[in-house]
């Protein structure tokens, strides 16, 4: 159950520092901890066992789930950095058991009732920026100083290395690995490793696949699919048509579907190509 907590009337078991500023209409579970000089605004809901570090700013409407750790200086729920924004009632939703490290910024969405959404068990390292309307699924790691532009979608268990920018509307696939300082302007296919400037698909993310429990037979079939897409003389359309007929591997199916949508769905940016 969520209850309204003010610094002056917090139970002794709930350490809310007296210098923290909490709006009377904010809703915090009794087990939430709030460090010195944090500011929690109106229309903010925070679930059980979440820890708010010093100098954190959380504006609403924002919902934060259970067991999250939000470190010093993070800023969540502020207005989008978007010239189209006209004060729409948008929000941020954050799931459970995330780590949001120092000075991370997460903006609200741009349009009415739209959401910037972060799932469960993610790690956002220091100085990462999550812009308006982004969606981050579960178990994603975003390293230091990664800047996500608006409307980016990141599937579960993707790994994004540090000091890079991702173009608006890009999709990053499941279990993809993006190398540090890459320039990401197009979609990153699932299960692949991408690096460089300009960025290129280099190989399958074999380490990530094995850690995720994908068996050797499935990986072997994925290697064949990868070679067909990126190492043959076929066009991407021809390769995807062949994959439709010979593989029931769910990982190959996901790769095929992702690439098909990347090239056919309006608003998608098309996939990053293979190495030259």
From Swiss-Prot:
Main localisation? cytoplasm
Q: Hey, which pathway is this one from?
A: Glycolipid biosynthesis; lipid IV(A) biosynthesis; lipid IV(A) from (3R)-3-hydroxytetradecanoyl-[acyl-carrier-protein] and UDP-N-acetyl-alpha-D-glucosamine: step 1/6
Looking up InterPro entries in the UniProt record yields: Acetyltransf_C (IPR029098), Acetyltransf_C_sf (IPR037157), Hexapep (IPR001451), Lipid_A_LpxA (IPR010137), Trimer_LpxA-like_sf (IPR011004)
Provide one Gene Ontology cellular component.
cytoplasm
Its domain of life? Bacteria
Q: Name one GO biological process term.
A: lipid A biosynthetic process
Q: Give a yes or no for keyword Lipid biosynthesis in this entry.
A: yes
Look up the EC number in the record and give it: 2.3.1.129
* Localization of this protein: Cytoplasm
Reaction(s) the record says it catalyses: a (3R)-hydroxyacyl-[ACP] + UDP-N-acetyl-alpha-D-glucosamine = a UDP-3-O-[(3R)-3-hydroxyacyl]-N-acetyl-alpha-D-glucosamine + holo-[ACP]
Question: Pfam families per the record?
Answer: Acetyltransf_11, Hexapep
Which is an annotated GO molecular function term of this record?
Answer: structural constituent of carboxysome shell
The kind of enzyme this is, by top-level EC class, is: transferase
Lyase as UniProt keyword: no
Which keywords accompany this UniProt record?
A: Acyltransferase, Cytoplasm, Lipid A biosynthesis, Lipid biosynthesis, Lipid metabolism, Repeat, Transferase
- What residues form the membrane-spanning segments? none
The UniProt entry's sequence similarity note says: Belongs to the transferase hexapeptide repeat family. LpxA subfamily.
Q: Which HAMAP family match?
A: LpxA
Cited function? Involved in the biosynthesis of lipid A, a phosphorylated glycolipid that anchors the lipopolysaccharide to the outer membrane of the cell.
PANTHER family on file: ACYL-[ACYL-CARRIER-PROTEIN]--UDP-N-ACETYLGLUCOSAMINE O-ACYLTRANSFERASE, ACYL-[ACYL-CARRIER-PROTEIN]--UDP-N-ACETYLGLUCOSAMINE O-ACYLTRANSFERASE, MITOCHONDRIAL-RELATED
Which NCBIfam families does the record match to this protein?
lipid_A_lpxA, PRK05289.1
Would you tell me the protein name for this molecule? Answer: Acyl-[acyl-carrier-protein]--UDP-N-acetylglucosamine O-acyltransferase
Q: What species was this sequence derived from?
A: Gloeothece citriformis (strain PCC 7424) (Cyanothece sp. (strain PCC 7424))
